[in-house]
Amino acid sequence: MGDKLLDPTQIINGLAVMLSFFVGYRYALKRGDAKDSVTEGAATPFSQESSVSSGSEASVSDKGYGGLNDNFKMVLVVRNDLKMGKGKIAAQCGHGAVGAYQRAVVRTPRLLRSWENCGCAKIAVRVESEAELMAIKKEAERQQLNTCLIRDAGRTQIEANSKTVLAVGPAAAADIDRVTGHLKLL
């Protein structure tokens, strides 16, 4: 064993590690505060047209954070009257889930993290008409829930610009159930 327990290079390396941790930690805190202040300032739903593969509409708000022990989910409302094939339904639901996720990343990141920590639950339910789909969308927006309406491009099975899927959430399961709880599973 040597005379010294720590030589100067070990001390300098230790200080450098602690300094880099401190700087990174402070940066993360500031960045998290900035994102949270953006979402906390939103009082009304946003609405936006988007050109995700099939095209979509969206609206969101901070509603749906729930409590710490709440379950979170996303519900995909599929139009059953269009008689889409299984693959087409899967693709349209994928567009809806991705669209809703992208909007939640920007507008409700804390809620999104809660949903991710609960396993990213997604439930597919059905409606029998466009009118019923739009009524669900209107109620979800009234409840200030994140929504993403998918319109088909019309390249395969169904007519162009058909409203195929509505994604609601992610949000607290209880909040979503108030809007979609009466619908039957797909």
Curated annotation (Swiss-Prot):
Cellular component, GO, one term: cytosol
Annotated EC: 3.1.1.29
Keywords per UniProt: Hydrolase
Entries under Pfam families matching the protein: PTH2
Signal recorded as keyword: no
Membrane spanning residue stretches: none
Protein name stated in the entry: Probable peptidyl-tRNA hydrolase 2
Organism, scientific name: Drosophila melanogaster (Fruit fly)
Species classification: Eukaryota, Metazoa, Ecdysozoa, Arthropoda, Hexapoda
